[in-house]
A protein has these predicted regions:
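N-terminal subdomain of nucleotide-sugar transferases
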Residues: 1-56, 90, 457
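Conserved donor-binding/catalytic core segment of Leloir-type glycosyltransferases
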Residues: 8, 202-219, 228, 245
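Extended catalytic core of nucleotide-activated donor transferases of GT-like folds
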Residues: 8, 52-144, 150-151
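A short, active-site helix/loop in glycosyltransferases that binds the activated sugar's phosphate group
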Residues: 132-170, 177-187
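Nucleotide-activated donor-binding/catalytic signature segment of Leloir-type glycosyltransferases, i.e.
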Residues: 256-285, 289
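Aromatic "clamp/platform" in nucleotide-sugar-dependent glycosyltransferases that forms part
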Residues: 302
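Short hydrophobic beta-strand element within catalytic cores of glycosyltransferases
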Residues: 319-322, 339-346
Length: 457
C-alpha cells in the first residue's frame, strides 16, 4: 500500500532554529510511515527557488528504503501561488504547518479552498494566557491541532469547545529530543570531552551555570546575570573561585542587550565565559558536551512556549532553574494533591500554574514563580501576560544548587533525565509516535469542506 504524503510548512529542517530541529525530528521519526514534502522557510534563503531531493540521503542515513523527502526552499514562509504550484506537483494528502499563526494568515485565507480536498494539521503553541480569542479563526482553520504544551492544549480546548471540535481533533504532543544528539555522557574522562572543556575554559571551574537561549528581551538575559551575581554575593571569596556564568548566545543583539556591557558594569569581579569568544557556533556533539559540562541550566524567560534548552539539559542529566511560565511548567513535574503529575486535561481548568496553584515538583528543578504578571500586547496580539520572576528568587535557587554539592546535583539531574524519557514523554520517539497516531486519526475522521455553489441571479 502506498504511503500518505504530508506537505509541511515550517523552517527548513536543515537549519538550526528550534522550529527547524523539531521539524527534522518528527519528519525523520515518521518517514517510514509517510512521504514528506516541505516548503522550507528561512530569512533570505540562499536556495530559494530550488528543489532539494533529500530522499537518497535519508535512505542512507536512516535506513528507510522507500524514504521520500523533498524540500522547496523559500524566503519567508511561502505564499498562495507557490503553495498551489507545489500541491499540483506533489499532490499531498494533508498539509501540516508549524510556528506562530501570524506567519500563516495567507494560508488561513485559503482554508476553505484547501479543505475541500486536503485536511490541515497545526502543530501549535501559545506562550501564555489570557486565552487568545484573536487566534480563534486561525485555530478554526485547522482540522487537527497538536499542542506542544499543556497550557496550549487548555487554550485550544477552551476556545474550540464552542465550535463542536471532537476529541480526536485535539491532543497534547510535547517536543521530543533524540538521544542521537543529546544524551548523558557517562565517561567524562574522554579525550574529546576534556579537549572541549579546555577550549572553552570550562575545566577551570567546578560550578558552571549555563544560559543557552537567544539574547532577546523576553528571555531576560540581564536578569539571569543578576541572579548569578545575587548567588555570588552570598559566597565566600574561595567559593566564588569555583563558579562561572556560561553565556552561549550572541553577546550583543539589537533584540536583546549588550551582555558584555551588562557583566562588565554590574558584576565586574565575577567570571563569565562568552562561548562565542572561543569558537562561536557549536555542532551537535559540542552542544552535548556543553550540556554535560555545566552543573545547572537556567531559563528566566517571561514568555516561553516550550523551552528546548532546559529540556535538552535534562536529557543530559543536568538540573534546571526555570521561571514557571508557558511550556516550562511541563518540565517541572508538578503534582496535584494526590501526588499525580498534572495532565493536559488538568490545564483546561487550571489554565496556568504561574500563580503557584500547585507547588509540589520534581527534585530536578528549582522552579521560580513569577512575582509580577504584566499584561503586554501589540496590535496583532492585543493581550498576553508577561510573567516576570525576580532575579533574587532565581539567585536563591542557584545558591541552593551550589550548596547541595555535585553528588546530589547528579542524583537530581538523573531523576530529571528519567522524567523526560518516561512520564514527560519528551523524546523524539514519543513525539513521532504521537504524530503517527494523530495523523492517522485525521485521515480516518476528517470530513471535507463543502464546495461553494455559484448561481446566476
Amino acid at each position: 500500500m502506498s504511503k500518505k504524503k504530508i506537505l509541511l510548512l515550517s523552517d527548513d529542517l536543515r537549519m538550526y532554529s528550534g522550529i527547524a530541529t523539531q521539524s527534522k525530528e518528527f519528519v525523520m521519526g515518521t518517514i517510514h510511515k509517510y512521504d514528506w514534502v516541505q516548503i522550507g522557510g528561512a530569512v533570505n534563503h540562499p536556495e530559494a527557488g530550488k528543489i532539494m531531493d533529500m530522499s537518497e540521503a535519508v535512505k542512507n542515513d536512516y535506513k528507510v528504503n522507500d524514504a521520500y523527502l523533498k524540500i522547496y526552499p523559500t524566503s519567508g514562509y511561502g505564499n498562495p501561488e507557490s503553495l498551489r504550484q507545489i500541491m499540483e506537483i506533489e499532490k499531498p494528502d494533508a498539509i501540516m504547518h508549524f510556528t506562530d499563526p501570524r506567519f500563516w494568515i495567507w494560508l488561513y485565507n485559503m482554508e476553505h479552498e484547501l479543505r475541500q480536498n486536503t485536511p490541515i494539521i497545526y502543530y501549535n503553541i501559545w506562550d501564555d494566557i489570557p486565552d487568545p480569542l484573536y487566534n480563534t479563526h486561525f485555530y478554526r482553520s485547522s482540522d487537527m491541532l497538536m499542542s506542544i504544551s499543556k497550557q496550549t492544549y487548555g487554550i485550544n480546548k477552551r476556545i474550540l469547545s464552542k465550535y463542536n471540535y471532537e476529541d480526536w481533533q485535539l491532543d497534547y504532543v510535547p517536543h521530543g529530543i533524540t538521544d542521537k544528539r543529546i544524551f548523558k555522557i557517562k565517561d567524562k574522562g574522554d579525550t574529546k570531552f576534556k579537549e572541549f572543556e579546555q577550549k572553552y575554559k570550562l575545566d577551570q571551574h567546578k560550578f558552571k551555570i549555563l544560559y543557552l537561549n537567544r539574547n532577546i528581551r523576553r528571555k531576560s538575559p540581564g536578569d539571569v546575570a543578576l541572579a548569578y551575581k545575587h548567588m555570588m554575593d552570598k559566597l565566600t571569596p574561595k567559593q566564588r573561585e569555583e563558579c562561572v556564568f556560561v553565556f552561549h548566545s550572541a553577546p550583543s543583539d539589537e533584540n536583546g542587550t549588550d551582555m558584555r556591557a551588562v557583566c562588565q558594569t554590574l558584576l565586574p569581579d565575577y567570571p563569565v565565559i562568552f562561548t562565542h569568544d572561543h569558537g562561536g557556533h557549536m555542532n551537535d556533539e559540542e552542544m552535548n558536551f556543553l550540556y554535560n559540562s555545566c552543573d545547572v541550566y537556567i531559563n528566566m524567560a517571561s514568555n516561553e512556549g516550550f523551552g528546548l534548552g532546559s529540556c535538552e539539559a535534562l536529557h543530559a542529566g543536568t538540573p534546571i532553574v526555570v521561571n514557571v511560565t508557558g511550556g516550562l511548567q511541563d518540565q517541572c513535574g508538578f503534582k496535584n494533591e494526590k501526588g499525580e503529575y498534572l495532565t493536559a486535561e488538568d490545564y483546561v481548568e487550571l489554565q496556568s500554574n504561574h500563580r503557584g496553584t500547585y507547588t509540589n515538583h520534581g527534585e530536578w528543578v528549582k522552579p521560580v514563580f513569577p512575582t509580577n504578571l504584566s499584561l503586554a500586547g501589540s496590535p496583532l496580539t492585543p493581550y498576553i501576560f508577561d510573567d516576570r520572576c525576580s532575579f533574587e528568587d532565581a539567585g536563591e535557587a542557584l545558591l541552593e544548587w551550589y550548596k547541595i554539592g555535585a553528588k546530589e546535583r547528579k542524583r537530581c539531574g538523573e531523576l530529571g533525565r528519567q522524567f523526560v524519557l518516561n512520564e514527560g514523554k519528551m523524546t523524539a520517539k514519543h513525539m513521532s509516535e504521537s504524530f503517527i497516531k494523530n495523523i492517522d486519526a485525521t485521515f480516518e475522521n476528517w470530513k471535507p469542506r463543502e464546495k461553494y455553489t455559484l448561481e446566476v441571479v
